[in-house]
């Protein structure tokens, strides 16, 4: 069974990242590699995590012309990752091209999910980039576009999960960042929830970074989270 917990490796160097990885169990959590760490360490670091039998979510949020995104998704799949993502705002043709690029992998292909609205966005900010929808409206609209394109699911704030499930179906995967423990500050995330709240809303996978990576005892935090989930 795939763990519900995805630990975000938000580090700026390999030593610190691997020190945390050494304390984690691939049976208990997946790992997320984002733009900072991938830019610094590249594909070899991802391959090392896969070699250690972790499921890896490669969080690079591809957004470009359809052909470029398709090739990027194919290259990501070659690394053996479990999940990759693209920006839903790239449009239907881009999403379809990304999906088609993974067909050759058959049942071994990575999950392909789309980013709806970043959890750092606050109500009203969409208008500054020319979008008149509210946050829930925009997230739901993009989720439905991703479903139409044949993607497996979306990245979405827990606040939008329930309506996305209603519109796109219970089997449509929701990956939820912006998860904070009750005693944590929001940091630069605006729309946050605790793990228990997010699961109640219907989130399938929870992405948790700083509450684990900045903890004095990360293993203890992970164990407590798993007990709660």
From Swiss-Prot:
Q: Which InterPro entries match?
A: Aldolase_TIM, OMPdecase, OMPdecase_AS, OMPdecase_bac, OMPdeCOase_dom, RibuloseP-bd_barrel
Looking up Pfam families in the UniProt record yields:
OMPdecase (PF00215)
SMART domains given in the database record: OMPdecase (SM00934)
Q: Name one cellular component (GO) term.
A: cytosol
Instruction: Cite the EC number.
Output: 4.1.1.23
What's a single GO MF annotation on this record?
orotidine-5'-phosphate decarboxylase activity
Reaction(s) catalysed by this chain's protein: orotidine 5'-phosphate + H(+) = UMP + CO2
Active site as annotated: 61 (proton donor)
Pathway the protein acts in: Pyrimidine metabolism; UMP biosynthesis via de novo pathway; UMP from orotate: step 2/2
Which annotated residues bind substrate?
10, 32, 59-68, 119, 180, 189, 209-210
Q: Which UniProt keywords apply?
A: Decarboxylase, Lyase, Pyrimidine biosynthesis
Task: Please give the family membership noted in the entry.
Answer: Belongs to the OMP decarboxylase family. Type 1 subfamily.
HAMAP family registered for this protein in UniProt = OMPdecase_type1_B
The role this protein plays is: Catalyzes the decarboxylation of orotidine 5'-monophosphate (OMP) to uridine 5'-monophosphate (UMP).
Protein name (Swiss-Prot/TrEMBL): Orotidine 5'-phosphate decarboxylase
Organism whose genome encodes this protein: Legionella pneumophila (strain Paris)
């Amino acid at each position: 069974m795939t763990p519900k917990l995805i630990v975000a490796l938000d580090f700026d160097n390999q030593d610190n990242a691997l020190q945390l990885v050494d304390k984690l169990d691939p049976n208990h959590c997946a790992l997320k590699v984002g733009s900072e760490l991938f830019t610094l360490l590249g594909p070899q670091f991802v391959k090392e995590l896969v070699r250690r039998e972790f499921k890896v979510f490669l969080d690079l949020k591809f957004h470009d012309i359809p052909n470029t995104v398709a090739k990027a998704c194919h290259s990501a799949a070659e690394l053996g990752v479990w999940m990759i993502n693209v920006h839903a705002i790239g449009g239907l043709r881009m999403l379809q091209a990304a999906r088609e690029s993974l067909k050759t992998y058959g049942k071994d292909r990575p999950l392909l999910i789309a980013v709806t609205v970043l959890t750092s966005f606050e109500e009203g900010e969409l208008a500054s980039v020319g979008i008149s929808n509210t946050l829930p409206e925009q997230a739901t609209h993009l989720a439905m576009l991703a479903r139409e394109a044949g993607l497996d699911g979306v990245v979405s704030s827990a606040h939008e999960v329930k309506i996305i499930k209603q519109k796109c179906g219970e089997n449509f995967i929701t990956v939820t960042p912006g998860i904070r423990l009750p005693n944590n500050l929001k940091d630069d995330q605006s729309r946050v929830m605790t793990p228990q709240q997010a699961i109640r809303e219907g989130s399938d996978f929870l992405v948790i970074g700083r509450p684990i990576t900045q903890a004095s005892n990360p293993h203890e935090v992970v164990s407590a989270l798993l007990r709660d989930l």
